[in-house]
């Protein structure tokens, strides 16, 4: 067997449809587009969501909600992710340096998910009740 002798299995490949190449092909003249109408023309077709002039669904339904700008700069950090940070004191800058949170994040809340293996000091971060208990049980502390 050589690379130049390899070929697909018989029947594995289908020949492409050759549209508009004579009546004998079955796809001649109109090329499978039927007669006249918007969809038969070049560039023909309607935009997404168009319902023939009827008010489309996306306009019949009311607008709702908004995107909180604070949510874009807030992140939750699991207890297990604190192990990725070097050093005993953890604050926003050390979390960013360890790539635990993104550069644009300004507010962080530590949540109870996973375990904290070593005593750490959290500085300037918000902490849930469960996470606070787990950190203090491991010998760590939380500074405001």
Curated annotation (Swiss-Prot):
> So which residues are the signal peptide here?
none
UniProt-recorded Gene Ontology molecular function terms: rRNA binding; structural constituent of ribosome
A GO biological-process term: translation
Cite the entry's keywords alphabetically. Ribonucleoprotein, Ribosomal protein, RNA-binding, rRNA-binding
Q: Does the keyword Ribonucleoprotein apply?
A: yes
Q: Which Gene3D superfamilies match?
A: 3.100.10.10
Q: Quote the cellular component terms of the Gene Ontology held in the record.
A: cytosolic large ribosomal subunit
* Compositional bias segments (type: Gly residues): 21-31
- For region Disordered, the annotated ranges are 1-52
What domain of life does the native source organism fall in? Answer: Bacteria
InterPro entries per UniProt: Ribosomal_uL15 (IPR030878), Ribosomal_uL15/eL18 (IPR021131), Ribosomal_uL15/eL18_sf (IPR036227), Ribosomal_uL15_bac-type (IPR005749), Ribosomal_uL15_CS (IPR001196)
NCBIfam families reported for this sequence: rplO_bact
| Family, as annotated | Belongs to the universal ribosomal protein uL15 family.
Q: How does it assemble?
A: Part of the 50S ribosomal subunit.
Instruction: Write down the HAMAP family for this protein, in alphabetical order.
Output: Ribosomal_uL15
Describe the function of this protein.
Answer: Binds to the 23S rRNA.
Q: What is this protein called?
A: Large ribosomal subunit protein uL15
What would be the name of the gene that encodes this protein?
A: rplO
